[in-house]
Amino acid sequence: MKFELQVTDKASDARTGIITTDHGQIKTPIFMPVGTVGSVKGVHFEELRQQVKAQIILGNTYHLYLRPGLEVIKAAGGLHGFNGWDRPILTDSGGFQVFSLTGIRKLREEGCEFRSHIDGSKHIFTPENVMDTERIIGADIMMAFDECPPGQSDFQYAKKSLEMTQRWLDRCVKRFNETEPLYGYQQSLFPIVQGCTFPELRREAAKYVADKGADGNAIGGLAVGESTEVMYEMIEVVNEILPKDKPRYLMGVGTPQNILEAIERGVDMFDCVMPTRNGRNAMLFTYNGTMNMRNKKWEMDFSPVDPDGCDIDRITTKAYLHHLFKAQELLAMQIASIHNLAFYLRLVTDARQHIEQGDFVQWKNSIIDQLGQRI
């Protein structure tokens, strides 16, 4: 993987770049649709390519490991061969999912023992077998296995957790370097900066991660209950230290406003389930604010969902989409999910354009309040 830093904004830390992988290029800033089990909920890959303009998607190691399982994925030639997506893929290590299984997992130095949410069977994730699993899945970008402490952890717990994450990172790097890709194309490993909301720990973590010299670096453990002000502060603290010549990935974030604020602070890559999850619940993101398509106000509105949006937005009226949601038609959730994902991709593409034009901060400031309105 190669990262070419192109333009850095003169008024902020926003920047543009190009990530080159063996499955294609990714223009940053970029939003990555979440395809947890190898698919993006409600959206066919052809729609992801043509309507959403997705350049890279996510898969989740925990879910893919449990179902369909590594035997199936390996026999198919990796996740690309299994699901037919021919562009880059990033896999989360599954750490967040495993540590979300409160009451059905046990944490120790070796790794994390857990029970499947599907059938209750026992499993263990270690840094070594997670690297092996991600090799079998075959994503272009693999995430290191880390502990994801609760958002409101106290300093002592957060420090202890970070120390374990750093030891696990060393084991991940060692295993990654000892193994080879299985399918003839390059894979990259991204370490993850943890440290909860403690600047001291975030600085320590960022320095530790930066010293690994990885192809890219991630910021984890944010948007888990802390205020947006604290989240932005942690991003600033970390990005002062992470190398500028490597892509920076903010995991699991967030709203359109969060994304623009993080771009201003030097983040390049984003993922979040919000576009599809909110879409399935009739909430549409637009530059004018958020629309609840179940509201009666749209019943007689025959204007397009978004006249400046993707093809589906332009041919679908608000009244028709309102009707589909009221009738509980599956098509409603599909259209809304496509719209939201396309909007997120449009947002980061527009951000890229304004960084290139040199007016990113003015543009961001002119739209950010409206993005948060309910209409």
Predicted regions and their residues:
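Non-catalytic, usually N-terminal nucleic-acid engagement modules in DNA/RNA processing proteins
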Residues: M1-L182, K296-W298
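C-terminal extensions of enzymes
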Residues: M1-T20, I26-P33, K41-G42, D146-Q152, ...
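Conserved, mostly hydrophobic/aromatic
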Residues: G24, I57, D92, E134, ...
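Short secondary-structure capping/turn micro-motifs that flank functional sites
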Residues: Y65, P150-G151, G225-E226, N278-G279, ...
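A non-catalytic, amphipathic alpha-helix used as a structural packing/dimerization or gating element
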Residues: N129, T133-I136, K160, M164-R171, ...
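Generic secondary-structure signature for well-ordered alpha-helical cores
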Residues: A139, D170, K174-N177, E240-P243, ...
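Glycine- and acidic
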Residues: Q152-F155, K159, G216-L222, L330-M333
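Glycine-rich phosphate/ribose-binding loops and adjacent secondary-structure elements
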Residues: E163-Q166, R175, T179, G184-V305
